[in-house]
Regions:
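A short, Trp-centered hydrophobic/proline-enriched beta-strand micro-motif
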Residues: 101-109, 153
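Short Gly/Pro-enriched turn/cap motifs at secondary-structure boundaries
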Residues: 72, 113-116, 140-143, 158-160, ...
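A short core secondary-structure module
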Residues: 130-131, 135-183, 193, 219
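Amphipathic, small/basic residue-rich leader segments at the start of a protein or domain
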Residues: 1-75, 83, 90-97, 104, ...
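A structural signal for short hydrophobic beta-strand segments in well-ordered beta-sheet cores
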Residues: 123-126
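Alpha-helix capping/hinge segments and adjacent helical runs
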Residues: 50, 141, 323-412
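Glycine-rich beta->alpha junctions and the first turn(s) of the following alpha-helix
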Residues: 178-299, 373, 409-412
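C-terminal helix-coil-helix/basic helical segment that borders enzyme active sites and/or dimer interfaces
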Residues: 24, 277, 281-288, 299-355
Length: 412
């Protein structure tokens, strides 16, 4: 195996030259990547990797892209969680079809009464022979409408403190006991779903981690969610044209479609400056001051993303840079919307086909969507709590019910 980055790049280049064919389907190409170990080079050899240091991932993906081939595989949040938490039976069943894109996943954590406090969930799982029977409701579930499997948290023991009686399951989504309903938002999009489970069934062994100890696995997923949010998506520019690229673009478009309204679109500093110039507002000292503030926030966000990338390359578990990055993105989104609003004035609230609507109505959409950035993936308040406790060493918020069986807490 290559000892240096240069050797590694050469090895990858030789393999891609021998195996990349743009006429392949995306699934066929991913099968080759996964079989070779280049799909997830830092994963253990047993689990479709090369056993390389974490820094090798970015080197390999960069070199594959330089060879005009597709480097991205849909690792998602389930991939690293299952890899870390196991057990082997779950790894053997789910990791390969996850990496090839054969099976699509969604996250089933939040509930109507358990959002920021996910551990307060009330969805139940009761063992019935060789299956778990699931009853409850989840909410804010991205991609649940076309997912094959769900990362599900459910309560399996009510007579212990709330964090101790949770189990992390793999839920088959395509079954009679699972109903998915779109959730309409104030910006008129339905980017999320509600999922209702009525006597849904899960095989007994489809548990990530251990029964009643699913909170540790859930924390792993949430840490990866914050980190991946700072790292960005797949790079498809410069890829050889063909079926694989067309399918990869369609897949990326579908994944991005539910987020198309997200205020990251407003965080593009270049677009904000371009809009200010087009409206004759670029010389306004107040607007220039706010644009300067946006540029500062945006660069700080980029540096945080660089720290997240460095942490991953050095093999360090997800740390506070995920929460810092999440907060930075929220600040950038709000500031960008503020600048747009200052430039447009009251016209900014015009939407739809109104001929006076700025940016063809996109600005109104952004203004209505910005609050979501501070909520989705963990509220700003949750990120502040994480940083205060894990970075600054401040005491946790007092909880008079801590340590009591959750059954008593719910009835109190």
């Amino acid at each position: 195996m290559a000892a240096t980055e240069q050797d590694l790049r050469q090895e990858v280049r030789v393999w891609v030259t021998q195996n990349w064919d743009p006429s392949l389907s995306l699934r066929e190409w991913r099968e080759r990547l996964v079989t070779s170990g280049w799909a997830v080079p830092s994963w253990p050899v047993r689990w479709y990797g090369k056993g390389l240091p974490a820094w090798a991932d970015d080197v390999v993906y960069d070199e594959i892209t330089r060879c005009h081939a597709i480097s991205h595989v849909p690792i998602g949040l389930a991939g690293p969680t299952i890899l870390e938490q196991g057990p082997d039976l779950v790894r053997e069943r789910f990791l390969r079809p996850l990496l090839t894109g054969e099976e699509l996943w969604c996250q089933l954590f939040s509930e109507p009464s358990a959002g920021s406090d996910i551990a307060g969930l009330t969805t139940t799982a009761v063992l019935d022979g060789d299956e778990w029977v699931i009853n409850g409701q989840k909410v804010w579930n991205t991609s649940a409408h076309h997912a094959d499997l769900g990362m599900l948290l459910a309560r399996t023991d009510w007579d212990v403190p709330k964090h101790n009686g949770i189990t992390y399951f793999v839920l088959p989504m395509k079954q009679p006991g699972v109903e998915v309903r779109p959730l309409r938002q104030m910006n008129h999009h339905a980017s999320f779903n509600q999922v209702f489970m009525t006597d849904a069934r899960i095989p007994k062994d489809w548990v990530v981690g251990e029964v009643n100890r699913g909170w540790a696995s859930a924390l792993a997923t949430l840490a990866h969610e914050r980190r991946f949010g700072a790292l960005g998506g797949p790079k498809l520019d410069g890829i050889d044209p063909g079926p694989a690229l067309e399918q990869a673009r369609a897949e990326a478009a579908e994944a991005a479609r539910v987020y198309s309204w997200y205020p990251q679109r407003a965080g593009r500093v270049d677009l904000v400056i371009e809009y200010a110039r087009s409206m004759g507002a670029a010389d306004d000292p107040l607007i220039r001051q706010e644009i300067a503030r946006l540029i500062t926030m945006h660069r700080a966000s980029q540096w945080t993303a660089d720290r997240a990338k460095l942490a991953r390359e050095t093999g360090r578990p997800p740390g506070p840079e995920g929460s810092i990055g999440k907060l930075a993105l929220s600040n950038v989104a709000r500031q960008a919307a503020k600048v747009h609003s200052m430039i447009s004035g009251t016209y900014g609230i015009l939407a739809g086909d109104d001929p006076l609507a700025p940016l063809d109505g996109l600005l109104a959409e952004i203004i209505l969507s910005v609050p979501a950035q501070s909520i989705a993936g963990g509220t700003d308040e949750i990120q502040h709590n994480i940083l205060s406790e894990r970075v600054l060493g401040l005491p946790r918020e007092p909880d008079p019910l801590k340590g009591r069986p959750y059954r008593e807490v719910r009835n109190s």
